[in-house]
Amino acid sequence: MNKCKTYIAIDLKSFYASVECRERSRDPLTTNLVVADPSRTEKTICLAVSPSLKKYGLSGRARLFEVIQKVNAANNIRKLKAPNHVFSSSSDDSTELQKNPSLKIDYIIAPPRMARYMEYSTKIYNIYLKYIAPEDIHIYSIDEVFIDVTHYLSTYNMTARELAMTMIQDILDTTGI
């Protein structure tokens, strides 16, 4: 009789946007950033949208013109609530924006840098290798893996969730992602 296997799936949040935020020493969770080539038309597809910018109703694969439209719409609403209906400045940080209604929502457009994303992906893969043998790591994409942890749970005396969280924390501590 075959024993059931245990797998974990790790999908890094808004990976390209997170890399671009870390490269700018910014918080990937609070920085409004899209990865897109602004030299193309506004119809270009964004390769990634940061979590804080998604809160304005954007999908992860929005077109640049949609980002512009959604942010403009959100700014129109904010302006009504701003003192004297005038913005004092702008910010691309969701924490600052939440604290100060007189700030205009801004965002960073980061041109794609695939080679840099591959470097981060390699660093992250090497972190997985600290815990798991390569034959048990199944790469799905640049930022997603499925890992067979069946034989590691007793070794580490952890649940699958605990092992996943240990690896994720190591990734965060090492890369900021």
Describe the function of each predicted region.
Residues 1-153, 160-161, 165-175:
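Residues that scaffold, gate, or flank divalent-cation-dependent active/transport sites
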